[in-house]
Amino acid sequence: MANPVVAIVGRPNVGKSTLFNRIAGERIAIVEDTPGVTRDRLYAHGEWLGKNFSMIDTGGIEMSDQPLLTQIRQQAEIAIEEADVIIMVVNVENGVTDADEQVAQILYRSNKPVVLAVNKVDNPERRLDVYDFYRLGLGEPYPVSSVHGVGLGDMLDAVIENFAEKDAEEEDDRIRFSFIGRPNVGKSSLVNAILGENRVIVSDMAGTTRDAINTQFTAKDGREFTMVDTAGIKKKGKLYENTERYALMRSMRAIDDSDVVLVVLNAEEGIRELDKHIAGYAHEAGRAVIIVVNKWDTIPDRDQRTMTDFTNLIRHEFQYLSYAPIVFVSAKTKQRLSRLPEMIEEAYDHQHRRIQSAVLNDVLMDALAANPTPSSNGRRLRVYYATQVAVAPPTFVIFVNDPDLMHFSYARYLENRIRAAFDFTGTPIRLIKRRRK
């Protein structure tokens, strides 16, 4: 199931983005930079005391054509719609402002848990000014300094106390997948077409507190799936609904709630920057990925060469998704749609594949013999052994004499050798370098 969602709201210049980056910072630093992945700080992962959660910085959703107070209200509404817990950020230097009171009133009526963070409390004298914020009616104000990291522990304790316990009954063996992509690539048509292909709809289930509709269905061969709503399709009347950044955020929510992600491209329009944003997030989240090129029926004079050229373009633009299979479909004519359930199941199985340590180390030793380890400043990298420590995605720890001696290119070489020996089509794999004690 998806992680709890924490939204950060507040008027401009109270330090929302600094707080967002401070909470996400340590988690983000763990993930090695992957060439070609464009990061977007609108949405990120956080962790506190072993509790994982996703964060939204609503201030990153731009509505510059709207009056300032209208923008603030809309951002608060987004937080209410999307979040399980809301952090409202205020600035101790300005005291309680009219804009703060407006946001507080909206949040108070929402019945969502709200944690009040009073930012820029950079010295002990400022702590006395914190008590004025009780008048917002949101409970205890937590003094923090997002720049210096002071007070974040107590605030995050309050945040995770409001996480609902996961209901064990919600877990099932169905494969959860979603169609994700920028607006107008044909996600809705694909959803309708694949349900039309399989027809046996078990139920439409209201999923999380955000009321996403997750559709359970059984494919013709008996395989069971849950299609995660990419959300936003069914919601109307919101000024922010059509913004690309909001579409990106909703796609990220669907990715977090899926085992397998189908990245949808529009064959007529080629590859856009937002496609890269969304696909990059799916890769970083460790989800299994299938690239679906929709509207293939609209390409004139299409043949095998046309398909090869488009495939080469995808491989060039999405180099970090070299493991993802590509399928060319048409929601309109239903061309190749029947392949999707089997491809989804295969990617899911590969994502959960486990390799015995003895077999893995045989492959590792062969790789070392074929391409000796690099050296730096007279010191050679020594690789001792490897073991698989997790699935979804498959994660391997490689024990070495000095992790700094393993260059990115050599780690990529070892990953390629592992992929050549074991079929991990459709799933990223993670290699963690660890010093042997």
Swiss-Prot record:
- Matching InterPro entries: G_ENGA, GTP-bd, GTPase_Der, KH_dom-like, KH_dom-like_a/b, P-loop_NTPase, Small_GTP-bd
Q: What single Pfam family name could you report for this chain, choosing any that match?
A: KH_dom-like
UniProt superkingdom: Bacteria
Q: Where does GTP 1 bind?
A: 10-17, 57-61, 119-122
Task: Name the Gene3D superfamilies for this protein.
Answer: 3.30.300.20, P-loop containing nucleotide triphosphate hydrolases
Looking at the record, the residues that make up the EngA-type G domain are: 4-167, 175-352
PANTHER family registered for this protein in UniProt: GTPASE DER
NCBIfam families attached to this UniProt entry: GTPase_EngA (TIGR03594), small_GTP (TIGR00231)
Q: What is this protein called?
A: GTPase Der
**Protein species of origin:** Limosilactobacillus fermentum (strain NBRC 3956 / LMG 18251) (Lactobacillus fermentum)
